[in-house]
Amino acid sequence: MQKIRNIAIIAHVDHGKTTLVDKMMLAGNLLKEQDNDNLTLDNNDLERERGITILSKNVSIQYKGTKINIIDTPGHSDFGGEVERVLNMADGCILLVDAFEGPMPQTRFVLQKALQIGLKPIVVVNKVDKPNCRPDEVHEMVFDLMFSLDATEEQLDFPVIFGSAKNNWMSTDWRKQTNDITPLLDAILEHIPAPEHLEGTPQMLITSLDYSPYTGRIAIGRVHRGTLTEGANITLVNRNGEQSKMKIKELHTFEGLGRKKTDAVNSGDICAIVGLDKFEIGDTVCDFENPEALPPIAIDEPTMSMLFTINDSPFFGKEGKFVTSRHIQERLEKELDKNLALRVKKDPEEDAWTVFGRGVLHLSVLIETMRREGYELQVGQPQVIYKEIDGVRCEPIEELTINVPTDYSSKMIDMITRRKGEMLSMEAQGERVNIEFNVPSRGIIGLRTNVLTASAGEAIMAHRFKEYQPYKGDIERRTNGSMVAMESGTAFAYAIDKLQDRGRFFINPQEEVYAGQVVGEHIHENDLVINVTKSKKLTNMRASGSDDKARIVPPIIFSLEEALEYIKEDEYLEVTPKSMRMRKIILDELERKRANKQ
């Protein structure tokens, strides 16, 4: 029997989780020194750009004759579905905290789940090489956090390791620098329990899946008890208790970054099974004769929905490869296989789908991925999902933490209370304050841009879903109207220049626009239809000095999330591989007026 340790790594965005795993792989001689510029784990472009881990990866290293399976978890609560299933594979966890920032709200979300399952934590205080960091205070903050999350006595007695993953050292005392990260690996062997070796009929809970064009879907999970062998007949039990008989074609275990084919897998190890059919995440693989299912994973309910529809704008099909409803339908179905917290509902009459997810980030990552693959689609404004609880209409409430310089704190509090938020606590940390609120999810849509503008870009904002509470009343939305293009054509600098006192533009001169496209923000509340395609009429009469150059303020450029949060109820965001345009749902001006009158 090989010795095994299964650990999950929990950390806030950008505290260095993926870097730490890279260094552990270096210690296990998986990577050569020269490969260590790029982060090996964040392997899709989106993750590298945003510095967030969306999908969990599995890696295993050998150390002192023990196999350590490292499971990288997504830190953001929008990916709640991912987090929970991943933690089910681990026996212990490493909580990674920044020596300056301390534990953040999203760390709290994952940590709470880990403590509930009963994982034993090791705390790593990272980035102690940074100036003005405060490792000892952070250590106390972690203790208080665990205490407030109802950790057991045993969990509270956690070992602490200090170090800098980037500079490749870890030590039990932050003042004594070492040369490598072995203190951390030793702590893992010492403090994290080995998986229990349970004899009996085999059981394995499927916690994630992979897809290969050759073998189809591959089930990944941790063998709970017994031994799985290649070629064995098994029973698959799904959530509803229905059974189906199948055969294991191939078994793979994780080794390094890849997988290795094997004949048998013992309890406690993590493996991948090829050859199963029609399984879902949360199903159990069990014995052929007397199947006993494990309890399925509870997954967080979605809290937001968005309308996806085919692109029907005048520029339809110019930039994307996949534009028809059949393409979008297939792509969404494929996403449902992997993305646990997602739900999709097709509109029977039109080519439209309502997609439910955990938050704006969760949905925007899907849209961004589709866009890069060459899809064209339109999305509506994000809507919050309401629930009836005991006959009362309830809405999702989130816990929001904002960290800003003290001068801006009153502005923040004012802005959030106007969005029906209630302030829970406020503590000063040097020149900055940390403020906590409970805010309806509706109030968070579109909040980030305003918070950053009001605090001159200094605010750090994080939020996570808390619970459903009774409806809090109406919230004021964006009050400015839109400037809408009157006719299709090329936008001219001359026209834009003459209209600048009417509001701010989103387009550059010489950009193609179509009638009904939103080209700017009006300074007043009503929508304004303008003609940006007017060019200057040329005559050969010239008075000296009357010819002014057009001077144009640079346009506002939106990121995908900002655009989603910006659009109104009667607008769509058109997303194509090359551009994003906001538009009115009804493009024709007369029809829009008619619809508004009714």
Each predicted region: which residue ranges?
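P-loop NTPase switch module centered on the Walker A-proximal segment
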Residues: 1-97, 101-103, 137, 141, ...
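Interdomain boundary/hinge elements
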Residues: 36-41, 149-161, 195-205, 241-254, ...
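Canonical P-loop GTPase G-domain recognition
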Residues: 120, 130-190
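Short glycine/threonine-rich beta-strand-turn micro-motifs
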Residues: 164, 347-362
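Conserved nucleotide-binding/hydrolysis modules and their immediate coupling elements
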Residues: 203-306, 314-318, 480, 489-539, ...
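Helix N-cap motif at beta-to-alpha junctions
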Residues: 225-227, 277-278, 357-363, 405-409, ...
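Long insertion/accessory domains within large nucleic-acid-processing enzymes
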Residues: 254, 259-262, 394, 439, ...
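A short, contiguous, amphipathic alpha-helix enriched in charged residues
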Residues: 313-336, 549, 553
